[in-house]
Amino acid sequence: MTASLHIILDTDPGIDDAAAIAAALFAPELDLQLITTVAGNVSVEKTTRNALQLLHFWDADVPLAQGAATPLLRPLRDAAYVHGESGMEGYDFVDHQRQPLAKPAFIAIRDVLMNAPEPMTLVAIGPLTNIALLLMHYPECACNIRRLVLMGGSAGRGNFTPNAEFNIAVDPEAAAHVFRSGIEIVMCGLDVTNQAMLSPDFLSKLPALNRTGKMLHSLFNHYRSGSMRTGVRMHDLCAIAWLVRPELFTLQSCFVAVETQGQYTAGTTVVDIEGRLGQPANAQVALALDVDGFRQWVAEVFACAP
């Protein structure tokens, strides 16, 4: 199959990010043209190191640019308690000499977008700081973005605060700017990603699959979003799955606003499912997932990796 969808991936690896990067690299329908890193799960220095380690592991020739070290207006609150101090605890990657591009992520994204023959798809599976910086500094780039597919937000409960999902809560000002920008957005939030559970039986078969399966199995052993006994949630992988298998998701067009001021609600995505606010929809929000179909696709795409 010839790859038909050219994508840019903005990420903060992160254990489930590693699985998403594998899918972005090896799903035959996708052509990954740039990876950018952002502070989120751990510091941007660590997310950059982790992404470079993964590219070296797979001998993948994809450029990488380091992005924002802090949210727009707030100090970074990371998720090392979920992913480990390094962000990818559990596997000993070999040393390498790879380096990021000598320009910040938002400029690297701009350069790829402006030189592309047609609008491209952005995929963001970390805080939206880099995407907001792109749209703030180069608003003309919006015309070159086919759509933004993001992992973040929730129409209900949060996983970082009672109401807020981690990626949005880390930099709510950036998320608010992106949702107000007018670009087409597909939001894969906790409503679907909490359903995207890889079962213990699925996980037990990974080491026999290939060296990627062995590596991911080692990482998942240290991933605190679930356990090897009960299953692990593949939050970030949902954004990649939607690109390739959108029929697995039930979407609804909604108006989404991001709360930036509330003492208890900052970072909350206000998803107006019933249209009570009278605002035009600015996102397609994923609300349900075909879990069996998702697991089947994950098995297929992991099998495509070395």
UniProtKB/Swiss-Prot annotation:
Q: Record's Gene3D superfamilies?
A: Ribonucleoside hydrolase-like (3.90.245.10)
What Pfam families does the record tag this protein with?
IU_nuc_hydro
The EC number on file is 3.2.-.-
Q: State one molecular function term (GO).
A: purine nucleosidase activity
Q: What class of enzyme is it?
A: hydrolase
Please give the GO cellular component terms listed in this UniProt entry. Answer: cytosol
Q: One biological process GO term for this chain?
A: purine nucleobase metabolic process
InterPro entries membership: Inosine/uridine_hydrolase_dom, IUNH, Nucleosid_hydro_RihC_nonspecif, Ribo_hydro-like
Keywords assigned: Glycosidase, Hydrolase
Q: Where is the active site?
A: 235
Q: Which CDD domains match?
A: nuc_hydro_IU_UC_XIUA (cd02651)
**What functional role does this protein have?**
Hydrolyzes both purine and pyrimidine ribonucleosides with a broad-substrate specificity.
Family recorded in the similarity comment: Belongs to the IUNH family. RihC subfamily.
In its UniProt entry, what is this protein called? Non-specific ribonucleoside hydrolase RihC
